[in-house]
Structure formats: C-alpha cells, structure tokens
Amino acid sequence: MRQILIAVGLALAVSILLTPVLIRLFTRQGFGHEIREDGPPTHHKKRGTPSMGGVAILAGIWVSYLGTHLVGLALDGEGPSASGLLVLGLATALGIVGFIDDLIKIRRARNLGLNKTAKTVGILAAALLFGVLALQFGNADGLTPGSPELSYVREIATVTLAPLIFVLFCVVLVSAWSNAVNFTDGLDGLAAGAMAMVCAAYVLITFWQYRNACATSPGLGCYNVRDPLDLALVAAAAAGACIGFLWWNAAPAKIFMGDTGSLALGGIIAGLSVTSRTEILAVVLGALFVAEVTSVVVQILAFRTTGRRVFRMAPFHHHFELVGWAETTVIIRFWLLTAIACGLGVALFYGEWLTAVGA
C-alpha cells in the first residue's frame, strides 16, 4: 500500500508541475489546437489552446513507476515486472502515434493530422506487438502477462482462444479503447477526470488480486494474475498523472491532452484489462468511453443507411451541448456517471469473489 501511495503522489507531482512548463513552451512555439468548424460554436474560442499535454501525463506515469520501484528496491522490494512494462510500453507506443498526429495538426494549422491509414497502422502495430508479447515472459508459476482465456473478473475456463485469435482479440481491444478515450476527449477535463476514476478502480481491483493471489494465498477465490501489485502501481501512477493534469485541463482548459494523451490512456485501459484478466469488466468500468465510441458508430451507420442522424453531433457529449446543456454541466454529469460505473464495476468484482469463497 505504501508503494501505491508513493506512485500516486509522484505522478501527481510530476504532472501538475510539468504541465504549466509545457503550456508556456507550447504557447511560445505556437503549438495551438485547431477547432472543428462544424463543432459547437462555443468551442471556437478554444482555438489556439496548447495541445499535446499528454506528454506530461506519460512523463508523470513513467517517473512515478520507475521512482516507486527505486524506493521499493531500497526497501527490499521487487523491480519492474513484465506485465507493468508491457502496459506502459503499449501506452507509450500509442502516445507516440498520437504525438505525431498532434504535431501534424499543429504544423498544418488544421484539425486533421495523420491520415486514417497511417494512424490505423500505427495503432495496429502497437496492438499487435502487445498481443504477441502478452503471451511471453512466463514466470516460475507459468503465468504470462496475458491469458488466452477470455476473462470477466477472472479467466473464463470454458472460453480459450487460440494464440492467433488472442493476438487479434488484443488488436481489437487496443484499437477500441484507444479510439474510445480519443473520442471522449472533446470537453475540458472530461477524459482526464473519467480516466482518473477508472484507474482508481483498477488500483482497488489489482491490489485485491495481489492480496488474494494464488501464488501466495492459494485457496478459494484466488487470482492467477502474473504481477498484480505492479499493475496496481501502474494504475496508481496513471490515476495520479491524470489528476495532476486535470488541475490545468479543467474548464476552462489551459491545455489539452491531445491524441498524445488520449491514445496513451486508452492503451492503459486495454493493457490493464488484459493483464489483470478483466477484459469484460473493463466495459463496465469504462462505460462512458464505451458509450462515446458507440455513439460515433451509431451515428455513422444511421447516416449511411437512412441518411438521417441519431444525434445532433457525435460523439454524443456534443449532442447535449447542442440541445442546450452547458459544457460544465455535461462534464460533471458524465463524471458522475463514470463514478457510478466504476462503483458498479468494483462491486461486481468483489461480489464475484464473495461468491467464489462461498461467503
């Protein structure tokens, strides 16, 4: 628990201190965000707000993760694990794709960065590598970071995927989550606040898995997760970094995370869901992100098949703005919904454990 608190504190400190430095730097360089012309009129005043704030989030996560392990090693703790490094590697790779996308948007002074093919290839390459590596690095107990068995709150023994199918499944998960967070990042602080809650929920889940790991506490309800404590540190670092960034990203935002941050954070959810064996539960925890990306898919399908739109604008947080909700009202209500979803997800996780132990 001490390491988790250190991870949160370090990430928050780095993020909250580095972000204003980036604001000044990006403002001097003219790295301003372009706004969609067809977006809500109230967003036009945001044109020129510095972007690529995801750099501070990733820096906070990495400094926290490595710093916490340095402290842990000094106190006879363990070093970085394959699972933790794999999740962070995925997030960083996606963050690099997002950074390139953001940079092109800024250089060309328009809200279009990498073309769809290049961006998709970048995301798929990161996802493919993650899927392949997730089944490597078996420990003394034979556990790898990922499992070919589909998982809800733990592995579902009756649904085992062939290695190739598992890799393709990871590609779908990573692509879906990175795009989901990316679509959600359209209002000041919305994605950062929601991500902080989802990551906090994952801290509780992975720490409970650590306390009830089959490797150290065999018995009813134990969890076969390779590095649960290290995953808790990753989740704690991500939560802290998002909170620190939110200090500057809350309405009215002084900086946006850009695709640098949103794609990376989507990778965090995807990576944690695979390595903690909670792939289906993640849909509950990240219900807001799922709803946002679903609204985009529904809007596209409806328009292509009927010529009509379901929402005034997608993602659907803009729909509520266009029907008269203030931006801050949408943000706060969506945060509340995320808190409810995370509470429900943790309750489902704990309830399953109670059932497993016969309580």
Curated annotation (Swiss-Prot):
GO terms for cellular component: plasma membrane. Its EC number is 2.7.8.13. One of its GO terms (biological process) is regulation of cell shape. Keywords: Cell cycle, Cell division, Cell membrane, Cell shape, Cell wall biogenesis/degradation, Magnesium, Membrane, Metal-binding, Peptidoglycan synthesis, Transferase, Transmembrane, Transmembrane helix. It catalyses: UDP-N-acetyl-alpha-D-muramoyl-L-alanyl-gamma-D-glutamyl-meso-2,6-diaminopimeloyl-D-alanyl-D-alanine + di-trans,octa-cis-undecaprenyl phosphate = di-trans,octa-cis-undecaprenyl diphospho-N-acetyl-alpha-D-muramoyl-L-alanyl-D-glutamyl-meso-2,6-diaminopimeloyl-D-alanyl-D-alanine + UMP. It comes from the Bacteria. It is found in: Cell membrane. Pathway: Cell wall biogenesis; peptidoglycan biosynthesis. One of its GO terms (molecular function) is UDP-N-acetylmuramoyl-L-alanyl-D-glutamyl-meso-2,6-diaminopimelyl-D-alanyl-D-alanine:undecaprenyl-phosphate transferase activity. Its cofactor is Mg(2+). Its main location: membrane. PANTHER family: PHOSPHO-N-ACETYLMURAMOYL-PENTAPEPTIDE-TRANSFERASE, PHOSPHO-N-ACETYLMURAMOYL-PENTAPEPTIDE-TRANSFERASE HOMOLOG. NCBIfam families: mraY (TIGR00445). Catalyzes the initial step of the lipid cycle reactions in the biosynthesis of the cell wall peptidoglycan: transfers peptidoglycan precursor phospho-MurNAc-pentapeptide from UDP-MurNAc-pentapeptide onto the lipid carrier undecaprenyl phosphate, yielding undecaprenyl-pyrophosphoryl-MurNAc-pentapeptide, known as lipid I. Belongs to the glycosyltransferase 4 family. MraY subfamily. This is Phospho-N-acetylmuramoyl-pentapeptide-transferase.
